[in-house]
UniProtKB/Swiss-Prot annotation:
Note accompanying the cofactor annotation: Binds 1 FMN per subunit.
Highest taxon of source: Bacteria
Name of encoding gene: pdxH
Pathway, per record: Cofactor metabolism; pyridoxal 5'-phosphate salvage; pyridoxal 5'-phosphate from pyridoxamine 5'-phosphate: step 1/1; Cofactor metabolism; pyridoxal 5'-phosphate salvage; pyridoxal 5'-phosphate from pyridoxine 5'-phosphate: step 1/1
Pfam families referenced in this protein's UniProt entry, alphabetically: PNP_phzG_C, PNPOx_N
Organism of derivation: Streptomyces coelicolor (strain ATCC BAA-471 / A3(2) / M145)
GO BP annotations, alphabetical order: pyridoxine biosynthetic process
A molecular function GO annotation: FMN binding
Physiological role: Catalyzes the oxidation of either pyridoxine 5'-phosphate (PNP) or pyridoxamine 5'-phosphate (PMP) into pyridoxal 5'-phosphate (PLP).
Protein's recorded name: Pyridoxine/pyridoxamine 5'-phosphate oxidase
Its EC number(s): 1.4.3.5
Catalytic activity: pyridoxamine 5'-phosphate + O2 + H2O = pyridoxal 5'-phosphate + H2O2 + NH4(+); pyridoxine 5'-phosphate + O2 = pyridoxal 5'-phosphate + H2O2
Record PROSITE patterns: PYRIDOX_OXIDASE
Swiss-Prot/TrEMBL keywords: Flavoprotein, FMN, Oxidoreductase, Pyridoxine biosynthesis
Lineage, uppermost ranks: Bacteria, Bacillati, Actinomycetota, Actinomycetes, Kitasatosporales
Annotated residues for binding of substrate: R27, K28, Q29, Y30, K86, Y143, R147, S151, R212, L213, H214
Amino acid sequence: MGGVTDRDADSAVPTADPVPFDLASMRKQYRAEGLSETELAATPVEQFARWFKQAATDGGLFEPNAMVVSTADPEGRPSSRTVLLKHFDEQGFVFYTNYDSRKARELDANPHVSLLFPWHPMARQVVVTGVARRTGRDETAAYFRTRPHGSQLGAWASVQSSVVADRRALDGAYAELAARYPEGEQVPVPPHWGGFRVVPDAVEFWQGRENRLHDRLRYVAEGGGGWRVERLSP
């Protein structure tokens, strides 16, 4: 009797389309107004404040302060994750995290970082590149006190980026902390948790335009605290 060969078995199994969409034809035509050099603010932080206000009030964004933070380890291997921006001013852009997390360990070894704000509904994005430094403990504590009680407990319960046995282990750690620090009781600031301030050396503002001829204007830091503006080809 003739058996079924591996080739016959393989051919009998229907092959699913790995991509059920025609990605090559998926595109949008941007029709937003452009961005010119004459419209820019004197500093990138002022310009960011303008755009952020629009993103937060008129942009239709769920979390306008969500940004993609990209870091690299000492061997140059990159990693990215979404983090919430919690403060910005002329001194830089601030976010908070577990200092034992992958991103924090990579920033301690290699402080060069990129922040990407993907404001897709507005056909805009902002890319900040610079150097990250830890914030002071007083600044960290002041922000920690503004967090919801549950988020404060979560900062203790999660050993961020470590392997956890299962969800029950994580929930169990949280439950123990909730019993120790019930609602209304002050939760101490974890020593392994705090902020990073990204001091920018370049900030690019991207505005989508028709025919993929987008506007890309980049502020580049110069000596003495000044900035020059460059237009980049799209």
